[in-house]
Amino acid sequence: MLLLKTEYTLWGVNMINFSNLIYLPVDVPNPPKGAVEFFDTIDYKDMIVDTYRTCHHIPIMDKDGTFSSEAKEVKGLVEWFENEIFTWSMPARMRIITTPPGGHNACHIDCSPDRIGTWQHKFRYVFQGDRTTLIFNNKEEDVRIHDVDKCYIMDGAWPHEMLNTTNKRKYTLTLGAPWEPQSDDKKYVEVLQRSYSKYKNYYISSEKWQLPENWKSLFQPEYDDQLYLLENYNGA
């Protein structure tokens, strides 16, 4: 965990320090309805297989900012991104994590070892499924997120896993690399501040957490050559 001041001053304003953010609902409109009906028509064989996270992905946008044909099939989805999300974030790789009924997305870390210690905030929205089955692993006890039907920001650098305990697919929108907002990103921090003011009762922080014993084994295998960077890092 990072023991940092809870508040600080930036741009002449008292700010909350989000370096320990694990989960925060975001004060933006939810995406348009109707996506689930279309996603249900897509066969698993036509999705991207993610062996590391043990799930399938429906592509929404490439890293270069090009919307997929699937994204364009959902009425209003492209416009929602352009009007509500990219005004404070940026076009980046977006996918729909698809977890089958009874499925389990393996515990993982959504960044490379050389990015540990930086903000690894990820944007998410659950179109269908039990929101509380996103689970963050720590040394003392695992913690589930709240059941709030809102987009949210989560910490991709903290070990986490996901279950689907329903009899339908779970669909989770993800926005990730190369978007990597930091504490000097004024537009992004303003969204966090506004969201915290509205949803602070649901905010989850890692301030008093400890990483699980096996956390260094949870990175993607392709990053094994970077693990030496963490030899003296214990999350404190």
Annotate each predicted stretch with a short phrase.
Residues 82-153:
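Catalytic core of non-heme Fe(II) oxygenases with the double-stranded beta-helix
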Residues 21, 120, 168-170:
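A general secondary-structure signal for short beta-strands and their flanking turns/coil
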Residues 27, 41, 99, 128, ...:
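Structured loops at beta-to-helix junctions and adjacent beta-edge loops in soluble globular domains
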